[in-house]
Amino acid sequence: LKILKSGVEMGLNISSLENMKLKELYEHAREYKVSYYSKLSKKELIFAILKARAEQEGYFFMEGVLEIIQSEGFGFLRPINYSPSSEDIYISASQIRRFDLRNGDKVSGKVRPPKENERYFGLLQVEAVNGDDPESAKERVHFPGLTPLYPDRHMNLETSTKHISTRIMDLLAPVGFGQRGLIVAPPKAGKTMLLKEIANSITTNHPDAELIVLLIDERPEEVTDIERSVAGDVVSSTFDEVPENHIKVAELVLERAMRLVEHKRDVVILMDSITRLARAYNLVIPPSGRTLSGGIDPAAFHRPKRFFGAARNIEEGGSLTILATALVDTGSRMDDVIYEEFKGTGNMELHLDRQLAERRIFPAIDIRRSGTRKEELLIPKDHLDKLWAIRKSMTDSPDFVEKFMRKLKQTKSNEEFFANLAEEMKAKRSH
């Protein structure tokens, strides 16, 4: 008991707790009166012990995403939606320098409440950075120093028979870890439904991947709908916010994703939409004096391209996948110019078709124009030959799409679909 008396004397920190066996952790959990400790995973148990210890000492245990105020050197941890709030935690410049903290790091630690003339909570001690020991944060390689490769690990999106859209994506526009994908969507073609299906497929099939859904300039009710139906992080800046806020939120989400990739994690950002982000930059950047048709400044493209271009598969481990929607046929020339500018930058495109949506054929995916570059790295060779046979037989008519979807719905999985296809091809050859 004497040994366990004080975590402070023992130097109870995240690295010492990680080296302990579960039996020892349970002893600490009992000492700090952690409830239901036997049901927690090791990582959750460590954080529960640190939290209980901080509370026993009269402090809070809090965490938030770091935003450094560049001109001042200090920063704030943003616990709510990556945006400034009354619950922000002040972190001093000396702590930032000591642990080599960067924008987007999720910092956890012991926090004291604000004194009478202060506005913010104050961080007293850094306990963890991105869930790891703070000392290990110093040894990370910076994101630009990591080696980008083509995606070579397939992200399986197929979940159940009824979710046809993700099955079509797996067949005709497969997504790999590290994909930079553009979902080209006219209005009312079902892009929100598609994003929700993709998000739920990722959380079901790849629970280890970190999912962030980023909604820029969207309707507030749509944000609520997605928050309730998606298990990942949903970060939003609705259309009633100023463009500066859209930019701030988007850039902090990108920094957060980069920090996770530096820790060799797989991160997926689903973004709606890159068009609205480019419009926000167009309003905020100082005018360069040149204007493209539609009234957009060419200088406004640099930073949204930096955002989209950050998606990559990393040789050293980890990946950043970005699937962003681009709006077309909205009646705005500017939106078309933005799409044209981003058209060649992705390595996967999924086109939604207004004609199909008007005929109530859902998912309204234009299967001819959708596809992935270097798909041979993601699809097995025997499946690839069959897919190319399907592509050769494709026509532009909506009837073909309807027939293709009917065939898909008749099979329980893509494997079964390929097996049926192989039999059909064999029968044709024998005739």
Positions of PLM-derived features:
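N-terminal "pre-motor" subdomain/linker immediately upstream of P-loop NTPase catalytic cores
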Residues: 38, 43-137
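P-loop NTP-binding catalytic core
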Residues: 101, 114-183
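A generic structural signal for well-ordered coil/turn residues at beta-strand boundaries
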Residues: 62, 120-125, 142, 151, ...
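Phosphate-interacting basic helix/loop segments used at nucleotide- and nucleic-acid interfaces
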Residues: 59-62, 164-168, 253-258, 307
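Basic helix-extension-helix modules of the SAP/HeH family
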Residues: 1-57
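Flexible glycine-/small-residue-rich
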Residues: 49-51, 68-70, 79-81, 93, ...
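P-loop NTPase catalytic core
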Residues: 181, 189-192, 197-431
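A structural connector/turn signal
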Residues: 94-96, 170, 245
